[in-house]
A protein has these predicted regions:
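Glycine-rich, acidic and aromatic/proline-enriched surface loops and short helix-turn segments
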Residues: 1, 237-241, 368
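Transmembrane beta-strand segments that form the barrel wall of outer-membrane beta-barrel proteins
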Residues: 1, 245-254, 408
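Residues on the lipid-exposed face of transmembrane beta-strands in outer-membrane beta-barrel proteins
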Residues: 12-16, 105-111, 163-167, 182, ...
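Glycine-rich, aromatic-lined ligand/substrate-binding cores of catalytic
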Residues: 498-533
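C-terminal transmembrane beta-barrel domains of outer membrane proteins
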Residues: 245, 296-297, 363
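Transmembrane beta-barrel architecture of outer membranes
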Residues: 5-11, 230, 264-268
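Surface-exposed loop/interface segments of Gram-negative outer-membrane beta-barrel transport/assembly proteins
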Residues: 15-102, 122-229, 256-257, 277-345, ...
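Short, solvent-exposed loop/turn segments at secondary-structure boundaries
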Residues: 2-4, 257-261, 423
Length: 591
């Protein structure tokens, strides 16, 4: 409620050619973007997220009953429970707003030496200034009924200066033609930020950072400065218009790495062979129904650096509960000798067209290996750090991509184009750290549920607790219930799923009739697992359909056994559906 977003764009562009034979050309563009936002929705499973509280609201309650009034005679929010937030109250008493002014400027100057050789210089700048404000009025349970005030400022700019010399000439030597380019780029990026928050206002609803105790004031300053200098180039050779060899290179020098490892080089090579053109020029030509045939193969490497200030451990300034200045170290141990990441890929494929381009197929196979990845591996807490930045890992992805396209119908006024895309990717963690098979690296998650990269496994495995079961004997495999007849979670985590889908499938159709076009896409992701925290919370709150099968909530007897002095006995205790689903959704991730 009350959300509003307005955006204003202004663009000015000018271009011209001049000089002898119009060999000089200039192009300049300036763009201004102003964005104003009010009451952006708060996301996540948090008490001040109105949508989160609505999801967990009993269906027997009409939310419109809380639209007016939203505050009682004591100034406190009116809501159906002690937790969560009334969305109508949030609109007026937990507002937020932000504004951004962004400027994009770029210009180029180009000179043509000949009809096949030219040079160009470019300059570009991207800068924006953002201001934000958030207010929380007194009476909300999300801040112990205290009011809160916060502001934020951010400044960002990135400048790029580049040059490029390029040339292209057919029949350079006999039937050989070629092209080349050589250039460079200077990139500089800088950002600053200031976040202020007064967690508890002394005078309620008087929104000032000075209205409160210093111990409740939080100030966070950020400063990031990074540069990357680059040289790059391309070289292409073609023979008679049907055989093509292309190569590229790039070398970056990043300020985020130390002097010894600051430079990193990555090349690529590709070869393509247009078989149909070759046959047409040196032979009798392709059959009439066989329109086009092309084969291709490529090798490429890509290097990546990291964010600034991750080489040396420094101390950050803060304060203790009494307001005294303190200095503390971060939780990550840095290594000044880390290098850039390296991603190596191989690809091969073919493209075929039939019946004057009415039917076509494109097939590709690829393999990529990401090595020397910049990772934060866990450390023993006795070291004083939680993790350490290292180069490690070898993650391999292999897959295929197939595209079928056809024009089944074509008349003077109507045509139908259809395209079917299929892709399949298989990932494997070849290695995380040398000599540590089976090592787990956390990618994200919450408490009992984690997404891991596991050495020897697939990327993005889902690990979590499972139901406790009897491991041997007469009742082997049955649920091991607690004394109340409810399921129990294992103490350790197990692999319970994989994020990776079995394959992706997409179908696009385009219909053209005279000057009208209609197009639609059907896209599908088949296989793969997800864990839904939304469903878990709905079950815990009794909102999910499964918590009242057939619209009834009758007690159930969970199938399983209970441990007793003589071993196990079959469970005969009945429990309410409320207790059952709360047991399943225990903690933050449930069983």
């Amino acid at each position: 409620p009350g959300a509003n977003l307005s955006r204003t764009n202004l663009t000015l562009r000018a271009s011209s050619t001049f000089g002898k034979d119009d060999r000089w050309s200039i192009d300049a563009k300036v763009q201004y973007i102003n964005t104003l936002a009010e009451n952006r929705p708060i996301s996540g499973a948090r008490g001040n997220n109105a949508f989160y509280t609505i999801f967990n609201m009993p269906t027997t309650i009409d939310i419109r009953d809380f639209s007016s009034p939203v505050k009682d005679e004591f100034g406190e929010m009116i809501w159906w429970s002690k937790g969560g937030i009334n969305p109508y109250w949030s609109k007026d008493y937990n507002p937020n707003k932000d504004s951004r002014n962004r400027f994009l400027m770029n210009g180029s100057l180009k000179y043509k030496f000949t009809d096949w050789l030219d040079a160009e210089i470019k300059a570009g700048s991207d800068m924006y200034f953002t201001e934000g404000e958030e207010k929380l009025y007194a009476g909300s349970p999300t801040n112990n009924k205290n009011s809160r005030y916060s502001t934020s400022e951010k400044k960002f700019f990135e400048n790029n200066f580049s040059f490029l010399i390029s040339g292209h000439k057919d029949e350079l030597f006999g039937k050989f033609g070629g092209n080349f380019s050589f250039g460079g780029n200077l990139m500089e990026r800088k950002s600053t930020g200031l976040d202020n928050a007064m967690g508890k206002l002394t005078a309620p609803d008087l929104f000032s950072l000075a209205n409160g105790d210093k111990k409740d004031l939080s100030i966070t300053e950020t400063y990031i400065h990074k540069k990357i200098n680059s040289l790059y180039g391309t070289l292409g050779i073609n023979y008679n218009g049907w055989a093509f060899l292309d190569a590229t290179f790039r070398n970056d020098w990043s300020s985020a790495l130390n002097k010894e490892n600051r430079s990193f080089f990555y090349p690529s090579v590709s070869l393509s062979w247009v078989i149909s053109d070759m046959v047409g020029k040196v032979g009798k030509g392709m059959p009439e129904w066989f329109t086009y045939a092309k084969a291709r193969a490529s090798f490429a490497q890509v290097g990546n650096d990291m964010d600034a200030y991750q080489l040396y451990n420094t101390y950050s300034i803060g304060s203790d509960p009494n307001g005294n200045t303190t200095a503390g170290q971060g939780k990550t141990k840095y290594d000044a000798d880390v290098r850039s990441e390296l991603i190596t890929s191989w690809e091969a494929g073919a493209e075929l067209k039939f019946f004057n381009n009415r039917l076509g197929v494109d097939f590709a196979w690829y393999k990529t290996n990401a090595k020397r990845q910049l990772m934060n591996i866990p450390l023993n807490n006795l070291s004083g750090y939680d993790n350490m930045k290292v180069n490690a890992g070898n993650i391999q992805n292999t897959g295929i991509e197939i595209m079928l396209n056809a024009r089944p119908i074509e008349t003077a006024q109507f045509s139908w184009d259809t395209q079917l895309n299929f892709s399949q990717n298989k990932s494997k963690i070849i290695e995380l750290l040398p000599g540590k098979p089976g090592m787990q690296y956390a990618l994200g998650g919450s408490d009992a549920l984690q997404v891991y990269a596991v050495a020897g496994g697939a990327y993005g495995e889902i690990w979590g607790t499972k139901y406790q079961r009897v491991e041997e004997g007469e009742f082997k495999g049955q649920l091991l219930l607690n004394e109340s007849g409810l399921p129990q979670a294992t103490s350790d985590k197990h692999k319970i799923g994989e994020q990776q889908p079995d394959f992706l499938l997409g179908w696009t159709n385009t219909f053209n009739y005279k000057n009208f076009t209609l197009s639609f896409l059907i896209d599908g992701r088949f296989g793969g697992d997800i864990f839904s925290f939304t469903n878990m919370n709905l079950q815990r709150s009794g909102i999910a359909e499964c918590t009242a099968p057939g619209g009834k909530r009758e007690d159930i007897v969970v199938a399983g056994v209970i441990k007793d002095g003589n071993g196990y006995k079959v469970n005969d205790q009945s429990v309410s559906l409320e207790r059952y689903y709360k047991a399943l959704a225990t903690g933050r991730a449930g069983i």
